[in-house]
Each structure stands twice: as C-alpha cells, then as structure tokens.
C-alpha cells in the first residue's frame, strides 16, 4: 500500500468512527462503577445552594465548571464534518469557560491540509485547547516515529495549550489496521517531556488507567491523567462494526468490555499519585460526575452525549446538555454540604459492591477515603 493510500486510510477510518458512534450502540455492556459510590445525604447542609462555587484550577488556568469536553474528532474525509463538530464544541466551551480537546491529529500530521478541521481559535479565542497524538506513534519500533517536531506541530498548528497522548492498546489490538507497537513509549514520552514546552496529558480511551501505569507516568513528569475508563463508549465495540471478517468481529466482541471501570481507575490514580485527574468513561449525569470529583478528579470528561448536537452544529444543544450536568453537580454538592470542589473531596463516601471488592485488593481503601485531595 502506497503512502497516499495510508494517509487516506487514516482519514476514512476517522469518518467511520464518527459514523458508528452516531448510528450504532457502541456503549460498554457494563457500568462505569459509580453506582457503587454513595454520598451520605446531609439533612442540614449548612450552606446556601446559590453560594456553591464550581470553579476548578488546572495546569495554571481557572475554569468556571469541572467539566472537560473530551477530544472526539478531526481530519475526517473532506474535513467539513470534523470541523463543524470541533467548532460547535469550542463555541460551547468558550461560553462556559471549560476546556476541550480535539481528536487524534495523526491525520493532520500526515495530511497537513486537514489542519482546519481541528482549528477553533476563530470561534473560541480563549478556550483551553488540548491537542492529541497517539502513544504508538512514539514507539521505538513503529515506522515514521513521532518526536518533538510532530508534538510541536500538533500543538502550535492549532494554537493549543497542551497535548494529550492517547493510550489505546485495546482499540489498536482489535483494529484491522491497528498500530500495536508500544515498545519504548514511556522512554520516548520521558524524552519528549524533557524538551516539550507545553503540558502533556496522558489519556486512555475506554479501558482505564491502573495505578501502576499512573505511577510510571508521574515519574517521567506527565502533567495530568485522563483515566478514560470502562463504562462508556467501547472502542472495541466500534471496531466490531468495522471488522472485515468473522475472526476480527469475534475478537472485538470478546474484548468489548475489557478494562478498568472509570470509578475504580479514578480511585487507583488518586491513591497512587498526586496528578490532576480527568474522569472520562460513561459520564452521563451530574451525580456520577459529582462522585468522580469527590473521589479526587479535577474534571469529569464527556464526549458521546455531545456528539449528536455537535454534528448538527447545534451549539445551544451542546450547552443545554452541559448546563444540565452543571446543575446536577451543584445540586449534589448542596445535598452533601460542599461549598466547592475542594470541600466535596472531604465529604463522606461509602463504596460498595464490585468497586469495593476490587479496591480492597488493590489499595488501602480506608486511607484513600480519608485523603482524596491532590
């Protein structure tokens, strides 16, 4: 296959991913674990609801709300669809003063003319924007290995503020054309971090981050972790619909629900590191988001629920969904007597079920529950 064909394949694949997310049920068949996390209701909150402050600080910036619009797309065929999605999300992020990411910029690195599909500064001059490259592209065994040049291009071409490195071994392992070269990625990221002038966020894409991986990432200076846990969109599920043969379909189906649930991943990363956490993975309501914040996350990240209005260019539709989450978070905070996110991390939590069973075998659960702040 020639170079041109490989470039086109990347762009076409991005379009197929969007299409399947919109038209198919690509949700995990299991929950993200937050049903096992319980707030203790306070009949006397001792605060006024309208005094609750939802602002958070992250990588030197202050944001009005603890919600992160997760990266979804960019570089799709014709670029128009991806551009519309990203600009719609960016307008919403600009209005609410919350951060957002773009989808993988691999297509842009290969075909620079697709850069406009990621560019949102014309509609969102102040938004905190996170670029996005894949971890396998930094492997020592991959052809056309990425380094400082590509990382700078990803950030500076779209005037981003930080770079996410997405770790998606599950998706790549079940994708027909997947990149399964991961040897030497940690060393490459350590070298990149030593030279790179922007923050780097390590990001999973639906299978969660364990405390072992989190500790390694913290040791090389990574600035934050997006846990991207199990319980939301299954990228193995997406690849099931893209598979070309029965073996490929069977493989993707078998691993549809592989991974670490989001709630568990948040707890492990918070227990083992002092890094800021973005809790993505099946975040579909403000109560679950408030639980993630109480467990130590700085943001709850959301993607798929915003995709349908974003495809239509419906900025108000995106904002409406986000405002619903915001009000649900605020209400949960009121009912546990938390004036701000810092206080929310100190309210009592009760963890039950599978999540408790897992965490009791993996961490000192009582110690974690006593100290959930950064």
Curated annotation (Swiss-Prot):
Gene3D superfamilies: Aldolase class I. CDD domains: IDI-2_FMN. It is an enzyme of class 5 (isomerase). One of its GO terms (biological process) is isoprenoid biosynthetic process. One of its GO terms (molecular function) is NADPH binding. Keywords: Cytoplasm, Flavoprotein, FMN, Isomerase, Isoprene biosynthesis, Magnesium, Metal-binding, NADP. SUPFAM superfamilies: FMN-linked oxidoreductases. It catalyses: isopentenyl diphosphate = dimethylallyl diphosphate. Its EC number is 5.3.3.2. It is found in: Cytoplasm. Substrate binds at residues 13-14, 104-106, 171. GO terms for cellular component: cytoplasm. Its cofactor is FMN; NADPH; Mg(2+). Pfam families: FMN_dh. InterPro entries: Aldolase_TIM, FMN-dep_DH, IPdP_isomerase. Mg(2+) binds at residue 172. FMN binds at residues 71-73, 104, 132, 203, 233, 282-284, 303-304. Belongs to the IPP isomerase type 2 family. Homooctamer. Dimer of tetramers. Involved in the biosynthesis of isoprenoids. Catalyzes the 1,3-allylic rearrangement of the homoallylic substrate isopentenyl (IPP) to its allylic isomer, dimethylallyl diphosphate (DMAPP). This is Isopentenyl-diphosphate delta-isomerase. It comes from Thermococcus kodakarensis (strain ATCC BAA-918 / JCM 12380 / KOD1) (Pyrococcus kodakaraensis (strain KOD1)). The lineage of its organism: Archaea, Methanobacteriati, Methanobacteriota, Thermococci, Thermococcales.
